[in-house]
C-alpha cells in the first residue's frame, strides 16, 4: 500500500515507493503529477516490465514505432525483454500505478542511485520485438491477467481462496475490494 514502502523519490510531481525488492521481483508504487514524463522509449534485455494503472491514465508507448496507447484505471500492460516501450502521464490529472520488474535486474538499486549498469538500453536499430508481443489486459479483466515463466498476475476477490504456490507471492489490495496477486 502507498505510504508503506521505501520512498526513493518524493517531489510534488513524482513519488516512488519500493514495495517489494527481491531477486525475482521488484514492485514499486508511483504517483506522477499532470503532464509528467516517465521513461522515453527503451528496451530491457533480460527482464520484463509491467504496469498496472491504479488512478488516472498512463500513456504507454510500445513497439518499434512507439505507438501510443492510453491506459485507463485497471489496465495491465506487459513489455517482455527486447520490446521497445516508454511511458508518461500526458493527462491533466494525477497518475498512480504499480510497476513490476521480473526478475528484478537490480531495478530497486537503480532507483536508489546505486546501479548504473541497470538493464535499460536504447531501442535497437532493428526496432526490437513487434508490438504484438506486448500484452495489454483492459480494465474489468478478472482472473489471470498474465501467466509467464517470470511472472503471474491475477485479480480476484479478497475472500476468494488462494492457491498455494512455491513462488514468491505479493498481494496488493485494490480500492474495489479485489486483490492483485503477483507471483514471481
Where in this protein do the model-derived segments appear?
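A cytosolic small-molecule/anion-sensing beta-strand core signal
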Residues: 54-55, 175
